[in-house]
């Protein structure tokens, strides 16, 4: 059996920008993407803690060390600058791999810098 499992998440990131007229996606600081093992164009789920919105999009790299979390395209209607979000990536695993897999959880501070690593 194959299972959809949480691979990683960036927990309680703060939206720094929203660009309604961009084609789509979420721009994430490259450092955070690497720590969370999220590749460019990888599908991610975004959960908005402020308003309960949930949506799927794909990740694109932001400037390394910038703390950028920018919601692009139509999803910009679901988040505002300053909103707290969780960004989750998933992987498909067989039962044995899923039982032993430890997801990466990246906690960030108010500037989207990793903490408690």
Curated annotation (Swiss-Prot):
GO MF annotation: an example: aspartate 1-decarboxylase activity
Enzyme class: lyase
Pyruvic acid (Ser) carried by residues: 25
Location within or outside the cell: Cytoplasm
Pfam families in the cross-refs: Asp_decarbox
Stored InterPro entries: Asp_de-COase-like_dom_sf, Asp_decarbox
Disulfide cysteine pairs (residue numbers): none
Pathway: Cofactor biosynthesis; (R)-pantothenate biosynthesis; beta-alanine from L-aspartate: step 1/1
Cofactors: pyruvate
Assembly information from the UniProt record: Heterooctamer of four alpha and four beta subunits.
Protein name: Aspartate 1-decarboxylase
Source organism per UniProt: Thermoanaerobacter pseudethanolicus (strain ATCC 33223 / 39E)
């Amino acid at each position: 059996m194959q299972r959809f499992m949480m691979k990683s998440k960036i927990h309680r990131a703060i939206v720094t920008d929203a660009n309604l007229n961009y084609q789509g996606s979420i721009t994430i600081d490259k450092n955070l993407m690497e720590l969370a093992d999220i590749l460019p164009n990888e599908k991610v789920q975004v959960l908005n803690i402020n308003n309960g919105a949930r949506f799927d999009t794909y990740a694109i790299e932001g400037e390394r060390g910038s703390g950028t979390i920018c919601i692009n395209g139509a999803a910009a209607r679901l988040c505002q600058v300053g909103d707290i979000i969780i960004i989750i990536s998933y992987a498909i695993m067989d039962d044995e791999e899923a039982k032993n897999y430890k997801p990466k959880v990246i906690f960030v501070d108010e500037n989207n810098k990793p903490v408690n690593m």
